[in-house]
Amino acid sequence: MGKGGNQDEGATELEAPMPTFRWEEIQKHNLRTDKWLVIDRKVYNITKWSSRHPGGQRVIGHYAGEDATDAFLAFHRNLDFVRKFMKPLLIGELAPEEPSQDRGKNSQITEDFRALRKTAEDMNLFKSNQLFFLLHLAHIIAMESIAWFTLFYFGNGWIPTIITAFVLATSQAQAGWLQHDYGHLSVYKKSMWNHIVHKFVIGHLKGASANWWNHRHFQHHAKPNIFHKDPDVNMLHVFVLGEWQPIEYGKKKLKYLPYNHQHEYFFLIGPPLLIPLYFQYQIIMTMIVRKYWADLAWAISYYTRFFITYIPFYGVLGSILFLNFIRFLESHWFVWVTQMNHIVMEIDREPYRDWFSSQLAATCNVEQSFFNDWFSGHLNFQIEHHLFPTMPRHNLHKIAPLVRSLCAKHGIEYQEKPLLRALQDIIGSLRKSGQLWLDAYLHK
């Protein structure tokens, strides 16, 4: 056991020699009320401070008892600034005989990945092209203008209404990809400007909450496809995913829905309802319950603008129906694109892998083309995005060949597929998981 196991959090000055710890002891501090983690072989007690973590206490808590070095590097842009907040939390370091990686994680893969990150920095791949993002914002605003002009010029008949709805759904989908860029701090050097524009895009252009998105999405990036850590695989008993969950449900005789038919009812309750029903309700309730008043003000500005614009054409009730029809269309786009990279991959309990291996196990790519890039917001490069979440999306294709080479060196599968096959694989994955559930339900 290491020395200093009862060190208090918040010690600002540690007298030499600094207390040392073994992994065996560090791994015990992985509770909600007792959290340690390791960054660059330094041990930090984040128990009380985690509630003040700007990215949310859950995302940092998911690394309690582990080495979080690569996650730390991946999520933060200004490392020197962030390290100022870490100094009071420092309680010691790893014992000299201890490996830098916990639980037997592959140190060679980690070393090679960090060298790859250094190469990306040397290639200036973390520098953004401001014009790229400005043009994306401009084409979103242009679509909003075209939508209004269509109704103004042609009237509110069925055909102009449907055309306008599709234009606005496209605008909303593209705004979703754009807010994703700012949310990941990948546009401006200063985090503050990314946060400000993120609130504008997700709040004023989409009517959603930046804090809600951060809370969910950063957890997804930290622990992708890990049950109880990645909120994106929490399907609220509506679907069973991967191989472990359906078998567990089957063994326990859990049958909230006929999961052997989930690949069929997915079309009825997945793409159509996620945004207009579940997300819309969850976002509003989260802003109110958690008192995200600034986010709520931004969202109100979106709804105010929308209803001022469209009540003259449809009235109050008609505008509400029109809004939800747009959400309905956007939801299909969002669900298919976001699920094609993850739901078909490994979904399991915590395996405690290194950063590189964990991201490759949970993500796959879709072939590059101008349409695929635009349609998916460059999330067709999901592997590279997960490895380097702060890298501007227009540079992801530049690092992809080097990522592929690193995968080949270590025998890690790098999956890339055509768009249509990626979409089809979603259904195949749901069918497979449903059959695993049925077999376990009937025979185990």
Swiss-Prot record:
Lipid bilayer topology: Multi-pass membrane protein
**Cellular component terms per the entry's GO annotation:** endoplasmic reticulum membrane
| Motif Histidine box-2: where in chain | 217-221
Task: List the ranges whose topology is Lumenal.
Answer: 144-147, 286-305
Which keywords does UniProt give here? Electron transport, Endoplasmic reticulum, Fatty acid biosynthesis, Fatty acid metabolism, Lipid biosynthesis, Lipid metabolism, Membrane, Oxidoreductase, Transmembrane, Transmembrane helix, Transport
Q: Which parts pass through the membrane?
A: 123-143, 148-168, 265-285, 306-326
The UniProt entry, under SUPFAM superfamilies, shows: Cytochrome b5-like heme/steroid binding domain
Which residues point to the Cytoplasmic side? 1-122, 169-264, 327-444
Q: Give the molecular function GO annotations.
A: acyl-CoA 6-desaturase activity; oxidoreductase activity, acting on paired donors, with oxidation of a pair of donors resulting in the reduction of molecular oxygen to two molecules of water; stearoyl-CoA 9-desaturase activity
What does the record say about domains?
Answer: The protein sequence includes a number of characteristic features of microsomal fatty acid desaturases including the three histidine boxes HXXXH, HXXHH, and QXXHH (these domains may contain the active site and/or be involved in metal ion binding), and the N-terminal cytochrome b5 domain containing the heme-binding motif, HPGG, similar to that of other fatty acid desaturases.
Output this protein's name: Acyl-CoA 6-desaturase
Q: What is the protein's species of origin? A: Bos taurus
